[in-house]
Structures are given as C-alpha cells and as structure tokens.
Swiss-Prot record:
This is Biosynthetic arginine decarboxylase. Substrate binds at L286, D287, V288, G289, G290, G291, L292, G293, V294, D295, Y296. It catalyses: L-arginine + H(+) = agmatine + CO2. It comes from the Bacteria. Transmembrane segments: none annotated. Keywords: Decarboxylase, Lyase, Magnesium, Metal-binding, Polyamine biosynthesis, Pyridoxal phosphate, Spermidine biosynthesis. The keyword Acyltransferase does not apply. The gene is speA.
Length: 668
C-alpha cells in the first residue's frame, strides 16, 4: 500500500498516530499543511513551522542532523514552574517563597545555561552545581542574587571556591554529602575567615520508583543518615555554629513517576526539618531535590517514561505537606527549593535528521514461477482473483516445479489456500515448513534457489496473515510479533550514542515522528537504524498509537525527495551524555526564537568537524597529512597514480578533515 494524499486521512488522524497531542504539552502540533509546528509559548498563533525552518537552514549550507533549541520553551517552562508554585503558595497561604535551582549537569551548554540564568534571575531562580567546573561556571555567569546550591562529592578546593564566593557576598550553599566534608568546610572557613552557610543532604527511608529509585533510600549513594545528621548538628551547636546549618536537602530520583512517592518523601523530610529547628539549627531552606517528571509518552501514568500528576499538583503537594508539618510544630515555613532540571530543559531541544535509505525486512516477493498471464505475482495479490472465502484462485498461477522439495510445496499450498478461517493453522504450518527447509539446506539437500523460494513464500504468508488479522478485534498472541518481524529499517543520519544515549543505555522513550507529509497516510511499519557500526545503534520502541509500540508508522520514501524525522524532548542529559562512538561528534545546534510571528535564528553553533573529533582522541592534522603524503609519494614512485591524482587525493583528505562528521546528503 502506498502513501497517498487522501482526503480521508486528516491532521487529526496523524495526531492520533503519533500521539503528538498527548506528549506535545502544547508546544508541538501539526499544521494544516501536514508539517510539525512548534509553539514556544504554547500560543498556536505564534508558531514555527519545523519543516520551513529546516529548509531555511539548509539554504545556509547547514546539513542535517541539526539540534534545534527553542529558547522560548525554556523561558515558558521556568515561568510555568514559577506560576504553579505561586498558585500553591497563594492558595495555601504559605508564608515563604519558592525557587528553582537548575542543575547544570542536565544541560551544560553555555547558551542553554545563559538562557536559564537570564530568565531565572528575573524569577529569583538559581543554579545547582555538582562539580568544580560547574561551580566555576555558575559563579561566573550569575550575580549576587542568583542562589547556587553545591551538591556532589567535594574536596578542599571545591569547598574553598564555594566559601570564597560566600565571602564575596554570593548566596552559595555547599551541601554536606558525607561527614568528612563538614570537616573540610570548617577548616576552610576558619582559614579564610568566613562564617559558613551550610546545607546537609539526608538519606530518607522513602524511595522513589522506576529506574531511578536507587537515588533514594538508605542505600543511596549520597547523603547522611539521620543519625549522622543529628551528630553533625550537635557538633555545630557545641561550636556555637548551629545557625550555620540552614538547608536540608533530599532527593528521591531524577523522574518521579508516581506522586505518592513525593508525598511520602515531603512528609518525612518536613518532620526532620522541624526537628532540626527545635534542636537549634538556623534552618531557612528545604530543598526537595529533583524528580519533577516529564511525560515522554503522553500516557499520564506512573510508567518510567511518564508521570501520573501535573506540575501544579506537584507544587501543591510540596507546599501543602511542608506547611502542614511546620504549622503543627509551630515552625516558620521554609523557603522551598527544587532542582527540577529535567522538567525545565527536556522539551526545548528537538533533533532533526534525514532518512538515508530503507531496508525491507521479510520481503514478500513471490518466487519467479508464480505468475499471472506471464507477470510475477506481487504479495498484495494485485490482479489475482479471490474466491468467496478469500483464498487465491490457483488456476491463474503456476506452482513450484515438481523437483522442489516437499516443504516448499507445502508453503505454496498454504499460501494459495489461506483464508480468515484457517490463517492460524496456515501460519503454524508455514513455520514448521520453513524450519524443515532450513534443516535441509544446512544438510546440503536443498539448493539455494529453493531456500530463496521458501523464504519468499514464508514472508508472503506472514504479510497475508497480518493483513487478515487487521480485521480481528483481538490479535492472537502468536501474531503480535508480526509487525516487528516484518518492519522496515529506516536508516537515519544520526548517532544514537551521541544524540540519544539514554535510548540505548536505559531504554528511555523519546517521541519520534516525521516533520512533513503528515496529510499522507503512513503505510510502513518501521524501526530506526543510525549510521554507527554497532548493532545497538537502533530505535525499536516508540511513542505512538496510544502507547509504547515496537514499530513506528512511516511513509514510503520518494525518489529524489528528502524524508526528515524529528526526535523530541532531548533537552535533558542527552547532549552531555552523548559519546563519540565511531567518532561521530556533536551535531550542529541552532537557537531559535519567535518574535511577532517571525522566526528568528539567534545563534548557530557548528557541529564538530572530523579534525576536531580526531583531536579529542589525540590525532593531529599535520601528522595525519604528513603520513598521507608519504603514502602518496610512494604511490607515485610505484606508478599507481600521477601527480594530478596525488593532488586530488590530498585535497580530498584535507576537505574531509574540515567537514562534518555525519554523512552528506547533498548532491554534488
């Protein structure tokens, strides 16, 4: 079945196929022209046509893949977070404020952090740093009004940098993750003459859920036990420094799927907070850590790729449960802090890539001896008469030669006699017949052409079974794997390990869909393959059709026309976790805004060149060219090439060194 522009296929059909209205969160939709729209402020009247944008960038000689960063989405996510907490604070009459501190580790790119610091400063938000490089960046980019929370393991130099910033009047809070860090803080504070402001991270009994549940609980990597926390507070009080402990921090996971875990954690942490106040700590802040989820699959569930709550519900629970515990204890409400990096950054980045080609899996071409009036039969039965129950009229077709082995004849009989009523029996018989053919072939008793005929007949049966099964209300378990088995592999110009590492490492789902041709009905079940030389470089789990699917519906490729796909919600962790597998480097990155309905390209960050990625692994251009020159001179001396060809060879290598690491799809 080909993909055609059909009035029966609508924009609504495309939206349901790719679930864009479920995971798009108001930022992504489909236009009347069948292209993907991006609405950074969730205002449909202020939208960017993704296909038009990519075409414009192509006119600037910017090849795909390209990572598009929409600054407006970053700003909108920060404002929405602020609005939700302000609503909760107002509704519950909470007597303090809220701040988000963005963990730089989520997306360390300077342009991204600058956008967040700029918008965050207006809202009173801050930065979380988990290493010395991140702290240096945070202090340099922020001002005195930007709070900086320092997490992670720390050495003397890390702590000295933090306390020196405190001495400058900066609001920097080093958080004690293990007991020895408090010793360092006290020593450095005494050395530089600062009365330190300190936070402590506690290990809660409450654990998160899903793949990040190990971030919380007694066995978590970071934090102090409650016993250690109290012992260190007693130590500070004995030194007349109880007022220095001002922040309590906990963390139950990077993505909290079930709101119940958050409620339990807040209640537990709030109880600890009020007890610290009673014991003499100068508490001011309750840092609830990360975990505010992102609904990658649009299911609004507690699955690992979703969340069963809204941002407003999250804010309400944090405020309400903290307030309730503090009011019961007669303790002032703390200033609330969250480290909601994933929720802020995920939506703003979109990776666009071009399809390079397709490999069909389980080709259903029938053997050459199956003909109708001299023409080979196609697997969709075009031009073939069917009887009243759907079987093929065999009088028009030739069967296998008599010399062919019996299992091949069995496959042929099953194919031509298959109906809705006997399709399961035929399918099972076909599996047995194919196994017999493979055994005969391995034993040297089945010629290669008969093996090809058997495989073609088997896949033709599978295609026909899948076609007949589409009318069934409930597909039998034996047939549920057919879409996956018969799916095409669409090869796209990207590296999974560079641009979507979480898809490979932890089976993270990311929405993927074409950015154009969405008014055409897609007809191909597909999985995606990248261009690395690694069998793991594939995507075979997708957000579509109302849930997680093993294949993605795509359109047949058209000769001479590009077919472009986008991966959405890759703004959190993917860029910084990406690696140089096969030396595919960073993609081009483009920062985009919209003003009065006009798309503005704010900046273009060119992707890595071949020379740059070779430099990362200690190769030098000069040395490589010198080595090549030696080979060229040897080839000239041996008469393999002339001087003109030598110049062409060296020039080609020099061009390659300055070129993009990804494949070129431009025609020369």
């Amino acid at each position: 079945m080909s993909s055609v522009l059909d009035s029966k296929w609508t924009r609504s059909d495309a939206s349901k196929t790719y679930d864009i209205d479920r995971w798009g969160a108001g930022y992504f939709s489909i236009s009347d022209a069948g292209t993907v729209l991006v609405s950074p402020d969730r205002d449909p009247s202020q939208s960017i046509d993704l296909k038009e944008l990519v075409d414009r960038l192509g006119q600037r000689n910017l090849d795909l893949p390209i990572l598009l960063r929409f600054n407006g989405i970053l700003r909108d996510r920060l404002r929405e977070l602020d609005r939700c907490f302000k609503n909760a604070i107002h509704d519950h009459k909470y007597q303090s404020r809220y701040r988000c501190v963005f963990p730089i580790k989520v997306n360390q790119q300077r342009e991204v952090v600058q956008q967040i610091v700029s918008e965050g400063a207006r809202l009173g938000f801050g930065i979380e740093a988990g290493s010395k490089p991140e702290l240096v960046a945070a202090v340099a980019m922020g001002d005195a009004n930007v709070p900086i929370v320092c997490n992670g393991f720390k050495d003397e130099e890390f702590i000295r940098l933090a306390l020196l910033a405190q001495r400058l009047g900066r609001n920097v809070l080093p958080v004690v993750e293990k007991v020895s860090e408090l010793d360092l803080i006290l020593d450095v504070a005494k050395d530089i003459g600062v009365r330190p402001t300190i936070g402590m991270r506690v290990k809660l009994a409450t654990r998160g859920s899903g793949r990040w549940q190990a971030s919380g609980g007694y066995r978590s990597k970071f934090g102090l036990t409650v016993a250690e926390l109290l012992a260190q507070l007693d130590r500070l009080i004995a030194m007349d420094m109880g007022d220095c402990l001002q922040l309590l921090h906990f963390h139950v996971g990077s993505q909290i799927g079930n709101i119940r875990q958050l409620k339990s954690a807040i209640l537990e942490a709030a109880r600890i907070y009020v007890d610290l106040v009673r014991r003499g700590a100068g508490m001011r802040y309750l840092d609830v850590g990360g975990g505010l989820g992102v609904d990658y699959d649009g299911s609004r569930s507690d699955s690992e790729s979703s969340m069963n709550y809204t941002m407003q519900e999250y804010a309400n629970d944090v405020v309400y449960h903290t307030q309730t515990v503090c009011d019961e204890a007669g303790v002032p409400h703390p200033e609330l802090i969250s480290e909601s990096g994933r929720a802020v950054a995920a939506h703003h980045s979109v990776l666009v890539m071009e399809t390079l080609g397709v490999t069909s899996q389980g080709v259903a071409n029938l053997p050459c001896w199956a003909k109708v009036e001299g023409e080979p039969v196609s697997p969709d039965h075009g031009g073939i008469e069917m009887d009243s129950v759907g079987a093929i009229e065999t009088s028009e077709m030739e069967g296998p030669p008599e010399s062919y082995e019996q299992p091949v004849h069995d496959l042929w009989v099953g194919y031509v006699n298959m109906t809705q009523a006997n399709m399961m029996e035929t399918f099972h018989d076909a599996q047995v017949a194919l196994d017999l053919c493979m055994n005969l072939f391995s034993g040297g008793y089945l010629p290669l052409e008969q093996r090809v005929a058997a495989e073609n007949l088997y896949f033709a049966i599978c295609h026909r079974v899948r076609e007949l099964a589409e009318s069934m209300k409930e597909r039998p378990d034996d047939l549920k794997h057919l879409d996956r088995m018969l799916s095409d592999i669409y090869f796209a110009n990207f590296s999974l390990f560079q641009s979507m590492p979480d898809s490979w490492a932890i089976d993270q789902l990311f929405p993927i869909m074409p950015i154009h041709r969405l008014l055409e009905k897609p007809s191909r079940h597909a999985v995606l393959g990248d261009i690395t030389c690694d069998s793991d470089g594939k995507v075979d789990a997708f957000v579509c059709g109302g849930g997680r699917q093993r294949t993605l519906m795509l359109h047949p490729l058209k000769s001479g026309e590009p077919y472009q796909l986008a991966v959405f919600m890759v703004g959190a962790y993917q860029e910084i976790l990406g690696d140089l597998h096969n030396l595919f480097g960073d993609t081009h990155a483009v920062h985009v805004d919209i003003e009065d309905g006009v798309t503005k390209v704010r900046s273009i960050v060119k992707g890595d060149t071949v020379s740059e990625v070779l430099g990362y692994v200690q190769y030098e251009d000069r040395e490589l060219i010198e080595n090549l020159q030696e080979s060229v001179e040897s080839a000239i001396g041996n008469g393999h090439i002339d001087h003109q060809q030598a110049g062409e060879t060296v020039a080609a290598y020099e061009r390659a060194l300055s070129g993009y690491t990804y494949l070129s799809t431009r025609t020369k």
